[in-house]
Regions:
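Short beta-strand element of the conserved SAM-dependent methyltransferase core
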Residues: 6, 66, 157-159, 265
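Residue-level signal for inorganic ion chemistry
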Residues: 217
């Protein structure tokens, strides 16, 4: 009995130590923080990333490359193909609402493959601390092909780097709950699906974007200029819109716009020569 008590005590101590060592999210702690000023600039995806900045490249559909100053490469909604450039990402994230958001056969050379789902209905919890970047997720529900609901089947991934809080809403099928908003914390930059049908209706997506109050909103999951233009036509006067034809931008805390800005990026696969 004494041995059993000692064993339990050791487990509790180890759990407490793990909780103490787990890096806290500054995006939650600073959810009421004030964003920076100035603006952001275009760049090639292969350019060195400026100090205290993150490069964002729109690859395709819901897939983005995030690159840090130290050369850490993360690809969202990874399908197994990013382009002709021989890139092995350090991290890929995936959601499984449709095959255009994941692959069952990621390259085994990728060090970290983060699936946005777990056992059916159970969800999954990610908290990957890579030093330069902390990656975590907030689970939401998705509809399945049979008209039912898979609880916690989608992940909103949050990437914390260079003092920024960058969110990818994934295949969002419902307005987040107050608890989910609280778990997200502050999002300076957010990638949001704007198709208006397969994911959230536009009215609900605009509600979500209004609640998040992100400085930079990057539309994704638009299937044509028609669906993109339909979304842009619904944007209220509180948003600025930038559409300069670029696929890549670099953003930092000091370069966030003073007004909420829809920044349209044009999807382009990664090429070795750009």
């Amino acid at each position: 009995m004494r041995a059993l008590c000692c064993f339990i005590w050791l487990i509790l101590c180890a759990s407490a130590l793990h909780a103490q060592e787990r890096r806290a999210s500054h995006c939650i702690a600073l959810a009421q923080g004030t964003p920076g000023l100035a603006y952001l600039h275009k760049a090639s995806w292969q350019d060195p990333v400026a100090r205290d900045s993150v490069l964002i490249r729109y690859i395709a559909h819901a897939s983005f490359l995030l690159r840090t100053e130290g050369g850490l490469n993360v690809v969202t909604d990874f399908t197994g193909f990013t382009g002709a450039a021989p890139l092995i990402p350090d991290v890929v994230t995936m959601n499984h609402a449709h095959e255009t958001h994941w692959t069952a056969h990621p390259d085994p050379a990728i060090p970290h493959v983060l699936e946005g789902w777990g056992p059916f209905g159970a969800g999954i919890d990610h908290h990957l601390d890579l030093g330069e970047m902390l990656i975590r997720n907030v689970s939401t529900d998705i509809r399945n092909m049979f008209g039912g609901v898979e609880q916690r089947g989608n992940s909103i991934f949050v990437f914390e780097a260079a003092g920024l809080c960058i969110g990818h809403l994934g295949h969002l099928h419902h307005v987040p709950t107050p608890e989910q908003y609280a778990a997200l914390g502050r999002l300076d930059v957010v990638m949001a699906a704007v198709d208006g049908g397969i994911t959230l209706p536009l009215d609900q997506m605009l509600e979500v974007l209004g609640r998040l109050r992100s400085s930079v909103i990057i539309p994704m999951h638009w299937f044509s200029d028609y669906s993109l233009d339909r979304f842009l036509a619904r944007i209220g006067p509180e948003f600025d819109v930038v559409d300069d034809g670029s696929s890549t931008l670099t953003v930092s805390l000091r370069s966030l716009p003073s007004r909420p800005t829809i920044h349209v990026l044009r999807p382009k696969h990664l090429l070795e020569e750009e």
